[in-house]
Structures are given as structure tokens and as C-alpha cells.
Amino acid sequence: MDNEQPHQELVKCVVVGDTAVGKTRLICARACNKHVSLSQLLTTHVPTVWAIDQYRIYKDVLERSWEVVDNVNVSLRLWDTFGDHEKDRRFAYGRSDVVLLCFSITNPVSLRNCKVMWYPEIRRFCPQTPILLVGCKNDLRYMYRDETYLSYFRDRSPFVRATRKSDLVMPDQARAVARELGVYYYETSVFTYYGVNEVFENSIRAALIARRQQRFWMTNLKRVQRPLLQAPFCPPKPVPPEVCLAASTYEENMKSLWARPVHTDVTLIAGNCTFSAHRCLLAAASPVFHRLFSMELSHELTPRSSSESSMVYASSIRVWEQLKRRSSFQVLPTMDNQRKTYGATRELNHPAFQNIRICLTENANGVQQPMTVVTLSKLITPQAMQQCLQFIYTGSLDKRYHDLQEIRQAAEFLELPQLLMVLGSIQTWEQFVNRDLKTRYKQVVRQRLEDICLEQGLFADVVFDLDDGSVPAHKAILTARCDVMKAMFSGDFRESSAKVIVFPGVREYTFHKLLCYLYTDEVPAISSARCLNLLELANRLCLQRLVNLVESRVIEDLERLSQNEGNEAVENCLRLLEPCKLHNADQLADWCMNHLCVNYNKLCKMSARSVRLLHPENQEYLNEHRWPPVWYLKDYDYYQKCLAEQDRENKPTLKRNRNQSGCLCFSGSSKTRREGSTGNGGATSTTSTETPADRPLFDASTESGEQAV
């Protein structure tokens, strides 16, 4: 041994065990402070031995061998060995101070070999050397079902398989072997670094205690403790699964509505060109269109404002009354007014518009419906109007059109400020600003759609009769955003021509959330107590993104509830678990299952009967994946029992012994021993002054604290 320091104890620690149990990894973790990744741990095993001469070659390895244990300076020298049974290891065993007998927690055969093969071999060459039983790869006791761990085995040879639950050695099984052999038991993991330093510190203690029994005159070893108890390893809390949202199709839906307009209710005439559009979208993008379409065309008065851009000709009270009538789909109050208005043209005092009128047209189903016709002034060219409409629907412009001045003039008259800013960024070549402006425009339009169409109910052309009320909607947006609605309004169903559609089994709260998604591609906050109806409706309409958004909102609500001291989050998860699977909300079901597993003890105390009412597969999953797992709870109870017994042993007795010591042979100590021997059936009693460090390393007559940890 090189570079011995004065007043330093040299401890030779021999590491033995079957091949591929993790001996060399354990030594490298301690001697070289080497941390390994999961991919490195799962590489194909190549038998190796860590060379002992590294203490002489590498200074940092030598310095890491120095350690202070219980105020004793120690230099720990680790000896690696081959795991083959037929190898001759007598040289490695020579002058060893302690032996680590290793096995793999994922290989029960390696534990059996510890008792059958390795322990007899150690005792043959080292009859008095202390032994520690070490379980390696402790991390695989909980990682064997981890998705990251399992993914490494999918693309490998079929002859290489991942660890299964049946392969695992539980702590009580290994401790039973340690108790049978009369040795201490520890567990380690070079992946999590659990127990690495602890096992070597306690191996040093075991070696120093054995050395103290042989060299009783060495005062520096008096305070060395017995190997300490190892706190059980608690697996990390399972991470809640993340919710993955289906890709948004909102922009594609709006582009398709622009490219193939259906259920249009307004026609714009610019020169010799006509453009079909939808009043709700035009009003959401442009305040001037909103004011135009909100006019009461049956009124006989002319516009009151002298401003060219103003088209509000009625008082605010009359406008509010007409908005209420619009929201109930009474565009024209009476049949007489309808007859007067259809075909009648109203001239407008605005630079962008000449006149507006309402006429009757036949839709694709042959049903007559009112159509608003707006004639544009010559200041807005057909090409500029086409670009403005394209921007309103899609948020983008045609790059092939280069006359930006015409578009700018039309945008000013139509009050499209976002389009003006986009044109400015195009002229200055600020593409990144252009992208931000488009994103901001889409947010503004969606917010305006929600306000105009959902809150005020303007420009609707269909009404849904629900269980607790009626809600207006717009066929064009429903058709573009939902394939089921598209089939209903476009096919040979009676709903395609109906003004009122009966929708049984749906309440107004649920349908409003559905419309929020269809119009804005977002879902407002949802209570976990009221989400099932919306999940059922979204699944019925084949809206997977809506299902994902509802899952995300409900999980946010459950996370908020879980921070409270009550059991409301657990109760809601238990209530949602199985219905979520029924409605294909699998991500929410997985999150609820994870939350129930983490709070399994609270769940059983709260409502054990509800757990028994779950589907047997769900009950089995909860029992299998509960956290903390059963083996940890058993190990923790054993650890607490050992600590309690250790405290009782170290606690001084309350009864004070009489001091009967005397001079030489005239003392009463011999009589006291004789009486104690008689009272204990011939067994020698331990005096109260005996310290834990003076007791043997392992007492096979005791059951816990003195045995395997």
C-alpha cells in the first residue's frame, strides 16, 4: 500500500459477487466519483476489474480514499474481483479487513449464490473478516416500469429484455439472507448515488471494530461506532403526465371558409366583381362593418352624423333595442317591414360604401334566405377588396399582389388598423414584426368574435334548442370548425334547412363552452365538477382538440384543489376516473389515476368502499402503482422498529447499581457476578456501563437493531 500517512488506518475492502451485479460500477462510483447515465448503465455488460494500482498512478484516486470516520483517519483501498465462480481469489482475500458481498436486486440467483457459494468461500479464506451484504441496482426496483427505461430495450436484440417485477428482490428477502448469514445489509445505486458513500463508511466501521478487538490498546478506535442503520430508499413521487394538445386547425378552417364560402349572408359588390362573405367575421374584424350591419334598414330616417365614416343614424336606445331583436333572430320586426325592405336600397354617406339592401336568395337546399348586398364605392378596387377579405379571414396577404397603396387606402376606409401595420412592416422589410402583428390580429378577431357572436348573439342564422334554453349560432363557423356539424348542415338532414335545431341532452353551460372553442379555438376555465357533459359532447362531435383543452383546464382546476388541505381533489379524481375513459379523455384519466396512486393512503382512509366499487383493472393498477409502494412501507416500519430498539439499548437504566468494588480479592464483584449468573440461568449479563461500540458486530440472538439493516 503506497503513501501511508501517519496516524492513519489502512482498510482493505474486497468486493465480491456474481458477474454483472455491479461491483465495478460501485467501486468506480466511490473511488473515482463517477456518475453514470441510464444509457451507460444499460449497455451490454463486459466483464472488467478495477485495478488496485490506480491508487499509485492517480493522485486524485488516492486522495479520495482518505476519509475520517468517527474521528479516525482512514485510507480505504478497494479491491475488485472477477465474478466467475471458478476463479482463484485467494490473493485478493489476503489481509483483507472487510468484504462486501454484492448481489443484484434484479437477479434473485445472485442473492442465492451469496449464501450458497460466496459466503462459504469468504469464510474459507477470511474466517474472522467482517462481511457486509450489499444489494446493487436499487434504482431498478421502481424504474423497471419507467417509460424512458423501457424505451432502451425496444430497438435492441430480442434476447435482451427489460427487468420485470418477478425479477426483483425485495428488502425483506435480502434481509432474511443477511440475518441467516449474520451480516449487515445495505443497498446502493450508482445511478441515484443512494447508499454509495454510506456502505463504504459502514464497511470501514466494521473493519475498525474488528481491528479494535485485536488491538485493544489503540485508543483512537475507542469511539468507533457499529455500522449504522440505513434509512430505506423512498422512490421518487411519480411525475404527473403532461397533457398533449392536438394540433390546432383553426387557421386551416378559416382558410377553407375563405376559399370555399358556404352559408354566406352578405355580398360585396366592387366594380364588376362580387364577393361572398359572412357578416359575423366582417363585423369582428372591422368596426365599420359592425356599424353597417347593425343598422335598422327598415327605418325611414337618414344617417344623422355629418362625419363621412359614421353610419349610426338612430339613438343609442333604438340601437340597443335593435341589437336585442337581432340577437333573437328578428332581423325585420314585421312582415310588412320585410316586404318594404326586401329589394329596397338605402344610400350610405360613407366613402367606402354606396348603398346597402336586403334581398331574398335561394341557398344550396333551395330554401329562400335574406342576403345583405353592399355596393362599394369606386375608391375600393376589386383587387384591394379581395386582399382585405383574405386578410380578414386568414390574417395574410397574397404576395403576388404588389400595389400596396390600393390595399392601404381600402384598409383605411374599412378601419382595419392591423392590416395597416402589416403593410407598414412589409414596406420596411420587418418580417419578424409582421409575424407578431398577424398573431396579435388573430387574437383580436377571436376576442371580437366571442363578444359579438356569443355574448351579443348578432348575425346568427340558426338557433339550438337545449334542455334549459336556446343559444344562437352561425352555420358558417360551425360548418368550418366541426365535421359533424358540416355533415348535418350540408347533407340531406332536416337540420340543414331548419332555423331551430333541437339538441337534447345538452345544457346551455355546456353548449356555450363548445361555441367558445369553435369560435376562438380556446376554452375558458372549467370546474372539474362540471366537465363530464362537455367531454361527452366533444367526444360525440369528434373534436379531439376540444377534449384535450378540457383535459388541460380540468387538470389545472384539480391541481389548484390539491393544494388545499381537504380531499376535494381526490374525490373529483375518483369520480372522473372511469367516465373519462368512456369519453376518450385518456390523458385526464391518466392524470386522475396518477393522483390517486400518489394519494392512495388518503383515498383508502377517505372512502375505501368507493375504491372497491372501481373496475377490477383500476383497483389492480392502484394497488400496483401506489406511492409509496408496499415494500417501502414495510422497510420503513422495520427501520423505525430498529431505531426504537437502538434507543432503548443506548438509554441508561434508571436503576442505580450499588458500588461494591473493593481491594483485590476482598471486593464483592465476584459475588455480584455469581448472583447475576444464577439469576439469568447461567447466561453472562451485560453491565450497564457497556457501550454499543464494545458489543459484537452482529448478535444473532437479537431480531432487529443488531442485525441486518
Regions found by a protein language model. Give the residues of each.
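Eukaryotic beta-rich interaction modules
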Residues: H7-K12, A29-E63, S75-H85, R112-V116, ...
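Beta-strand-rich binding-surface signature
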Residues: Q8-C13, D18, T24-R25, V61-W66, ...
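Long, low-complexity intrinsically disordered regulatory regions
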Residues: S37-P47, I52-Y55, W217-P261, L297-A364, ...
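N-terminal BTB/POZ boundary and linker segment
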Residues: F216-A277, Q390-Q409, F413, P417-K475, ...
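BTB/POZ-protein C-terminal extensions
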Residues: K438-I477, A487, A498-E508, R530-N533, ...
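Post-kinase regulatory C-tail/linker adjacent to protein kinase catalytic domains
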Residues: D139, T163, F216-Q230, P303-S309, ...
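TRAFAC-class small GTPase G-domain
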Residues: M1-R211, A247, A259
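Canonical BTB/POZ domain core
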Residues: T267-I269, C273-S276, L282-L416, V463-P472, ...
